[in-house]
Amino acid sequence: MKIMFVAAEGAPFAKTGGLGDVIGALPKSLVKNGHEVSVILPYYDVVDQAFGQQVEDVLYFYTQVGWRRQYVGIKKLVKDKVTFYFIDNQGYFFRGRIYGDWDDGERFAYFQLAAIEAMEKIGVIPDILHVHDYHTAMIPFLLKEKYHWIQAYQAIRTVFTIHNIAFQGQFDPGMLGDLFDVGIERYEDGTLRWHDCLNWMKAAVLYADRVTTVSPSYAHEIQTPAFGQGLDQVMRMEAGKLSGIVNGIDTDLFNPARDPHLPASFSAEDLSGKAATKQALQERLGLPVRADVPLIGMVSRLTDQKGFQLVLEELPHILQQDVQLVLLGTGDPDYEAAFSWFAKAYPEKLSANITFDLPLAQQIYGACDLFLMPSAFEPCGLSQMMAMRYGAIPIVHEIGGLKDTVASYNAYEKTGTGFGFDQFSGFWLTQTLLFALDIYHNHKEDWQTIQQHAMTKDFSWDTASLAYLDLYKSLL
């Protein structure tokens, strides 16, 4: 099977979040199953700086972005048996950042047109074309409405994955003619219209052969007004082709037995190194070195989506307990200031690290006994899976991917991989934390059982990719 991915970012070339992780890992896993996999990405300046000496120039051509005749350079790099093609246009992609420019609509309109036309130029016509988030969401529409006359493209089946429905790509409808060079009919008949805007994501949901989200629970949630961001009715209408597949994590990279960032290695069979890692982190951050105190970690963007309003609301109560908290992340300036204030007020209980530091993040996963992740909504989430791999037991709001990946502890059946609360409130966050602390202090055998279950749960991409393969095969 020939599978092609088109996305705005992908590790290790350019990455800002979970989308980049998926594009870095899923193709690599599919290749292991004997499939021919390629990826099309923009050739950003950050890619040029890090990989410019490794890529090869394949060809170039020109495409029409409305009335604009734009250069399209194709560069190529084979990595882990996956063929990466890069769309090169310095005017659009050498901006010092991936997103956030005033002309993002034009930039990604160009990228989608160039990617579609590049398939024929480089001679790679996939069986499955898998596009991701709004930046590539017009591709299924364009294949059926603009490029349908190209015979080689007529057998291509498209899959669209929603990583976060909040970012839909809403633009002025004049873009259809001005950039995509197609008629306005599909806007005027309501197909592409949403609140008097052209909505790229709506186009993908209606035109793609299959639509996926990054967890089964999120696939259900986006069909409701509470989580659908205005597209819930469209999601319900297209529910027959909507499904959720949980992201995996790179289990080679996130492995406490071989993590170079940890001062001591450990595994589910031998946890002695975890105690040494905990002591090293306490020393590094200036917390009292105590093996008996529960160490609670938080590694996250400091935003409302991640539930930090609940954490701040309950922090005075939580800090009355005999616990230590370690925070790592940046985000909303109000949250940054609040956690910094609490860290100064409680220097022996809270270490607030307002930065992004990958080695420190790995040490927090490795050192902590508990991991706090009370997100208001979470399409999938990766941190909770990483924490479990390192024996840090997650406390989560049971929503989206958190609900699908963390099984709440059952005291009677002795099952579960963490602790969860259903109601998004500070009260239930604190009650769940107190319950977890009781198990930690007073039921050591149960705690060790939870830790074993968490550390041995299979979150590998090899498992997740099989679900995608089943989906692809159903289309052929």
Swiss-Prot record:
Pathway: Glycan biosynthesis; glycogen biosynthesis. ADP-alpha-D-glucose binds at K15. Its EC number is 2.4.1.21. InterPro entries: Glyco_trans_1, GS/SS, Starch_synth_cat_dom. Keywords: Glycogen biosynthesis, Glycosyltransferase, Transferase. Gene3D superfamilies: Glycogen Phosphorylase B. It catalyses: [(1->4)-alpha-D-glucosyl](n) + ADP-alpha-D-glucose = [(1->4)-alpha-D-glucosyl](n+1) + ADP + H(+). PANTHER family: ALPHA AMYLASE DOMAIN-CONTAINING PROTEIN, GRANULE-BOUND STARCH SYNTHASE 1, CHLOROPLASTIC/AMYLOPLASTIC. Synthesizes alpha-1,4-glucan chains using ADP-glucose. This is Glycogen synthase. It comes from Streptococcus equi subsp. equi (strain 4047). The lineage of its organism: Bacteria, Bacillati, Bacillota, Bacilli, Lactobacillales.
